[in-house]
Design a protein with these regions (language model features):
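Bacterial N-terminal signal peptides that target proteins for export
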Residues: 2-10
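Bacterial lipoprotein signal-peptidase II cleavage site
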Residues: 23-33
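Short, glycine-/small- and polar/acidic-enriched structural segments
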Residues: 34-184, 190-193, 209-215, 228-231, ...
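Short, solvent-exposed loop/beta-turn-alpha elements that line the ligand-binding surface or hinge
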Residues: 80, 134-136, 302-309, 331
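Pocket-lining segment of extracytoplasmic ligand-binding domains
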Residues: 113, 122, 190-191, 195-281
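Secondary-structure end/capping motifs
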Residues: 251-326
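Conserved C-terminal helix/tail region of periplasmic/extracytoplasmic solute-binding proteins
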Residues: 317-341
Length: 341
């Protein structure tokens, strides 16, 4: 009887327990893919470091050899290749060399002879590219005779004083051209007339029977009656000019020099394709005498390249023969082709 009473009570209690369990809220699980937030410090914005382009100071004579540099400037090519260029006008080669020696110019158009003289004790300058090189029909240096002299051939210059700037590329080219024409060393006579205006005036008056001039001044003299006796268009190995930089500048800023030369390369292509487009620069930069504006034919400019070791050694032998140098100056250390585009 007692057992029969307990079973109904047990069943009632069990039913109440199950009901209460069913009504309890279920536990919430954190999904495995839900990120757990953590405290982070606020981000600090950073600014990109802007490096200013290197500025190269170029000493420039008023000569046609510099024309590609002005084309590069006019076309914005120096900026395109990440370099600033400042032109420093000079009136003479000695002034140019003084600025380079003092570190007031970084580079210039010059000749291998000038680099040799800088480098006779220690390497200070390196030629990195041809600037202008004679080609067929486009001479760089001209041996001219006065119209009053009657001289028309190299043979006529035997024993005749020829006005030059002594100890320079002009004297070097003069001797090499006449030697190539068959004259011997004792038949070649030069006289120092260092200033080009004086040389031109003496030629015109007949006081000087012969003299050597670079183009376009040679073209002007011919227009005034001078006679072309010889020029270096058939001997480009003698009369070329180069672009040179101080070695300290090259060592410190090789990428800037590479950018400069890349700009010159593109400017050269533009100039050779359409020289007439840049006629304004001939007058603006005083590269051509006023009487020749509109008449002077701009020569083709060389593509990337540097003087050969044979060209270097020939000029070196000449300089040593003149007593300008007493030591061999290293070609490998003085001519640098690694920066060309």
């Amino acid at each position: 009887m007692f057992v029969k009473k307990i079973r109904p009570l047990f069943l009632i209690a069990l039913a109440l327990g199950l009901a209460l369990t069913a009504c309890a809220p279920a536990a919430t699980a954190v999904p495995a893919t839900e990120p757990v937030e953590t405290a982070t410090s606020p981000e600090v914005p950073t600014e990109a470091v802007v490096v200013a382009p290197v500025t190269l100071k170029i000493a420039v004579l008023p000569i046609i050899d510099t024309l590609p540099m002005y084309v590069a400037q006019q076309e914005g090519l120096f900026a395109k290749y990440g370099v600033n260029v400042e032109f420093v006008p000079v009136a003479s080669a000695p002034e140019r060399d003084q600025l380079l020696a003092a570190g007031q110019a970084d580079g210039a158009v010059n000749e291998t002879l000038a680099d040799m003289l800088f480098n006779k004790d220690t390497i200070q300058m390196q030629a990195v590219r041809y600037a202008l090189r004679p080609t067929a029909g486009h001479g760089h240096f001209f041996i001219l005779a006065s119209a009053k002299s009657g001289i028309t051939t190299p043979d006529g210059l035997k024993g005749v004083e020829i006005g030059v700037s002594q100890g320079t590329i002009i004297e070097y080219v003069t001797e090499r051209l006449l030697q190539s024409a068959g004259l011997t060393a004792d038949q070649i006579k030069t006289i120092a007339v260092p200033k080009i205006p004086d040389r031109m005036a003496l030629l015109a008056s007949g006081e000087l029977k012969a003299g050597v001039l670079p183009d376009p001044l040679a073209s002007l003299a011919v227009g005034q009656g001078a006679v072309i006796v010889a020029d270096d268009s058939t001997h480009p190995e003698f009369g070329f000019s180069v672009i040179s930089f101080r070695k300290a500048v090259i060592d410190a800023n090789p990428e800037a020099i590479k950018g400069f030369l890349a700009a010159i390369e593109e400017a050269t292509a533009l100039l050779n394709a359409d020289a007439a487009k840049y006629a304004n620069l001939l007058s603006d930069q005083k590269l051509v005498p006023p009487p020749l504006i509109g008449k002077f034919q701009v020569p083709p400019f060389p593509i990337a390249g540097v003087p050969t070791e044979a060209e270097w050694n020939d000029a070196l032998a000449w300089a040593k023969g003149k007593g300008m140098l007493t030591v061999d100056v290293s070609y490998a250390d003085s001519v640098n082709a690694t920066l060309l585009p």
